[in-house]
Amino acid sequence: MLRAILALLFAILYLIIGIPVLFVEWIIGKFNRQAADISQLRMVQWAFRVILFICGTRLTIIGEENVPKDQPVLYIGNHRSYFDIIITYSRCPRLTGYVAKDSMKKVPLLSVWMTRLHCLFINRSDVKEALKTILAGIDNIKNGISMCIFPEGTRNKTEDLMLPFKEGSFKMAEKTGCLIVPMAISGSADILEAHFPKVKPVHVIVEYGKPIDP
């Protein structure tokens, strides 16, 4: 339980202390948007690595050499834990936005950070709004920003390896021609979800497959 409390406290403090940092980055972005974006990417990656350290999470990364570093891609992965985002974002070699459920927009501070990091919010129950999100993701990729989507549309809480993919999950790659990088995450649910609210130190394996040309 102590690990969970420490990780939560660190995350909250980071979000609060980071407010003036966001303001400074916003000013920098007026003159050099890329420099501001890269700075925020590295800051958040550092914070996520600290959270993983506090939680005692040990990572084995397989196939990271398959991830292109010179072009935007669409990451596609299975989704069993909130920690999937923390784990995979900490490994991104370039700017990457995540597609999150629409309800995340209501979370104070976190939604501000997510928006600044090019994350998008999707409402799958509203076809028009969902299409707007996909189009925004296409624009991100065209502007050199990778995107990550969990095509199951929600965390998989079943015994099945994966849930059916939601419609439109691959549209961003189809419309931009960017490579698709498949990710397989194993063991992440054992950090928290398997025994909520306790956090336990576990071994998580992340495997990146070879890029797929749509």
Regions found by a protein language model. Give the residues of each.
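A cross-family acyltransferase "interaction/gating" segment
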Residues: 109-112, 145-148, 157-214
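Catalytic core of membrane glycerolipid acyltransferases/transacylases, capturing the structured
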Residues: 22-41, 54, 69-127
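Short gly/ser/thr-rich secondary-structure transition/capping motifs
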Residues: 54-62, 130-131, 188-190
